[in-house]
Amino acid sequence: MDHIVPPGSGEEPRHHGFPYQFGDKPAGHAWYPHTPAAPPGLKFILPVLNLGPAGIMYGQPTSTFNAHSSPTGLVWLGAGWPEAVRDTFLVGRLGSFVMGPGADEEHGFDVLQMRMERRADGSWAARTTSFLAPLGRPIDLLPARPGLLYILEYTRPTDLKGRAGWLPGRVLELRATAKN
C-alpha cells in the first residue's frame, strides 16, 4: 500500500507484513517451509480486523474473511445513498465449492456491508454483515452514480447442493429509492 498511499511528512514507511506475516497470524508463524524470517525490529501495520458477525471463522474476529471465500468489487457508498448504508463499504464475497473448516459450512455467495470503526489504538475494524444473499458468485460491483450500483454474478447456484443445471451469470441493479 505504501506505493499507493506514501507516508506523510515525518512519518516512517509502513510495512503490512508480506512475506513475513499473513493476516493476523504472528510473523513467527511460518505458513510455508520457505517463508523467510522477519528482519529484527520490523514493525507491522496489522490489517483491518473483521468483527463480524459475517465473514468470520469459528465465531472469532479475524483479519480476513472465511476460508474458501474471496472479497471482490469493493465499493464505498457515500452521499446519495440512504442513511442505513451511507458511509459504508459493500464488497462481493465469491463463494467456493470447497466446504469451510466446519461441517457443512459454506461461505460466500453474498454481498457484505462493512461499517468501519476507528479503534482506540488508531487501527481500524469493520462490523461486517450480510447485505444481499443468496447470490450466485458475485465477481464485481460497479457504482454507476450515487444511489445506483450494478452487481455482476459469475453463475447462479447459491450453494454446493445445486450443482446441476447452472444458469448463466447475470447483472443485478441495486437502486436506492426515496421513502414515501
Model-derived features with residue positions:
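Beta-propeller domain segments
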Residues: M1-T129, P146, T158-N180
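Conserved loop/turn at the beginning of each blade in beta-propeller domains
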Residues: A67, P134-L135
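Beta-propeller and closely related beta-sheet repeat lectin domains
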Residues: T72, I139-D140
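Residue position within the beta-strands of beta-propeller blades
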Residues: V91, Y150-E153
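Conserved catalytic network of the ASCE P-loop NTPase/AAA+ motor domain
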Residues: P143
